[in-house]
């Protein structure tokens, strides 16, 4: 039996390319500082082609932020459920997050812009659909900590 090439979904590949190229734009300039025209130019698409993939800038922005966050979430979640005491896991989590922020400048800037965003609808979508699992995992770890015990 001959080998068969696995066909990829061209729309999915293009969406991934758009995320990869638009996230640094949002990281540098924030939501308000990036236009769909800027993204289309960076990606090498027409605006019409960009709108084929995303209904509006909100959808693109939220999808790009989600993609960037999820790309890093697995490593952080592994730390939270790894071996060790709750204090040790919390320390490794904070260290890992700090290292991530120190070495991935675009991700750091994107997180800063997300935190500064005053649009309640976007904040709500991100909190409920992107950050919720991580918030719950950190909360669960915190609930394991003995408040009467010093970490050291």
Give the role of each language-model region.
Residues 1-5:
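Short, intrinsically disordered or compositionally biased N-terminal tails of bacterial proteins
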Residues 70-78, 92, 120-146:
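Amphipathic alpha-helical packing segments from all-alpha helical-bundle domains
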Residues 102-125:
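Amphipathic alpha-helical segments used for helix-helix packing
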Residues 44, 60, 68-72, 103, ...:
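Amphipathic, well-ordered alpha-helical segments in soluble domains
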Residues 63, 77-103, 137, 146-151:
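Hydrophobic alpha-helical connector segments
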Residues 6, 17, 21, 25-59, ...:
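Helix-turn-helix
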């Amino acid at each position: 039996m001959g080998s068969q090439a696995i066909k990829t979904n061209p729309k999915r590949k293009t969406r991934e390319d758009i995320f990869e190229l638009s996230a640094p734009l949002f990281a540098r300039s924030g939501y308000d500082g990036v236009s769909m025209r800027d993204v289309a130019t960076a990606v090498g698409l027409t605006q019409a082609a960009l709108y084929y993939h995303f209904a509006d800038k909100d959808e693109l922005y939220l999808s790009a932020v989600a993609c960037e966050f999820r790309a890093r979430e697995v490593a952080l979640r592994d730390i939270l459920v790894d071996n060790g005491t709750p204090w040790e896991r919390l320390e490794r989590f904070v260290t890992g997050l700090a290292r991530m922020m120190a070495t991935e400048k675009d991700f750091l800037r994107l997180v800063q812009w997300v935190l500064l965003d005053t649009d309640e609808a976007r904040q709500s979508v991100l909190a409920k659909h992107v950050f919720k699992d991580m918030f719950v995992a950190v909360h669960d770890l915190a609930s394991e900590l003995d408040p009467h015990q010093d970490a050291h």
